[in-house]
């Protein structure tokens, strides 16, 4: 079920206006969709934070604009201040509940990989997986247990696909997480590979010195 969030119309969202809005505790935003004309709005930062914590990053939100029409939306894009962590701007996308959409779902790793205790390094290559489904069926996150991964092991999309209840868009060969060998081991392997690839040097026969001319 979608959680309700109130919004205010903001016909003017120029730079000076957006700064003023943020100081008042609001976040500049826009709501749009395939059948919805883009409309600038603002929402209270505190209310938005509570809503996202409740429904998740890909959750459905019932956006009420000044006691008018309610829009069933999802957060399509969220801009944040990298230093302060404040919300700068939000894009709300109005969804058709009967049509499938694509969404990026966060990946959460659980457990401690066996290879890490053996000296390996856990490397997460993908932090989001793209899925396609009805808006109401999009998972909040995809959880992967890495406990059984030894050094050299990895989890690819093909390993994830069967455990996700919706369609995964990514290619099977894409690697989500892997356990790499220790740095020293990797360096030795690299040096060995370089040595093997070096061409063999064939010693050339020295040319006999020219005989000195007889005086």
Curated annotation (Swiss-Prot):
Keywords: Ribonucleoprotein, Ribosomal protein, RNA-binding, rRNA-binding. The keyword Zinc-finger does not apply. The keyword Metal-binding does not apply. CDD domains: Ribosomal_L25_TL5_CTC. Residues 186-215 have a biased composition (Acidic residues). GO terms for molecular function: 5S rRNA binding; structural constituent of ribosome. InterPro entries: Rbsml_bL25/Gln-tRNA_synth_N (IPR020056), Ribosomal_bL25/Gln-tRNA_synth (IPR011035), Ribosomal_bL25_b-dom (IPR020057), Ribosomal_bL25_C (IPR037121), Ribosomal_bL25_long (IPR001021), Ribosomal_L25_dom (IPR029751), Ribosomal_uL5_bac-type (IPR020930). GO terms for cellular component: cytosolic large ribosomal subunit. Residues 174-215 are annotated as: Disordered. Belongs to the bacterial ribosomal protein bL25 family. CTC subfamily. This is one of the proteins that binds to the 5S RNA in the ribosome where it forms part of the central protuberance. PANTHER family: RIBOSOMAL PROTEIN L25/GLN-TRNA SYNTHETASE, ANTI-CODON-BINDING DOMAIN-CONTAINING PROTEIN (PTHR33284), RIBOSOMAL PROTEIN L25_GLN-TRNA SYNTHETASE, ANTI-CODON-BINDING DOMAIN-CONTAINING PROTEIN (PTHR33284:SF1). Part of the 50S ribosomal subunit; part of the 5S rRNA/L5/L18/L25 subcomplex. Contacts the 5S rRNA. Binds to the 5S rRNA independently of L5 and L18. This is Large ribosomal subunit protein bL25. The lineage of its organism: Bacteria, Bacillati, Bacillota, Bacilli, Bacillales.
């Amino acid at each position: 079920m979608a959680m309700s969030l109130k919004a205010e119309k903001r016909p003017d969202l120029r730079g000076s206006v957006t700064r003023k809005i943020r100081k008042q505790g609001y976040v500049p935003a826009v709501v749009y969709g395939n059948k919805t004309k883009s409309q600038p709005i603002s929402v209270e930062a505190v209310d938005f934070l509570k809503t996202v914590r409740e429904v998740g990053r890909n959750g459905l939100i019932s956006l009420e604009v000044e006691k008018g029409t309610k829009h069933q939306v999802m957060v399509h894009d969220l801009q944040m201040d990298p230093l302060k962590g404040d919300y700068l701007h939000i894009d709300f996308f109005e969804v058709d509940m009967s049509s499938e959409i694509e969404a990026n779902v966060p990946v959460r790793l659980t457990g401690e990989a066996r290879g890490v205790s053996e000296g390996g390094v856990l490397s997460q290559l993908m932090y989001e997986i793209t899925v396609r489904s009805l808006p109401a069926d999009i998972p909040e996150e995809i959880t992967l247990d890495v406990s059984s991964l030894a050094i050299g092991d990895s989890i690819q999309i093909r390993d994830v696909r069967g455990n996700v209840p919706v369609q995964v868009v990514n290619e099977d060969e894409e690697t989500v997480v892997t356990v790499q060998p220790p740095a020293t081991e990797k360096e030795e392997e690299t040096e060995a590979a370089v040595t093997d690839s070096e061409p063999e040097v064939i010693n050339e026969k020295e040319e006999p010195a020219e005989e000195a001319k007889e005086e």
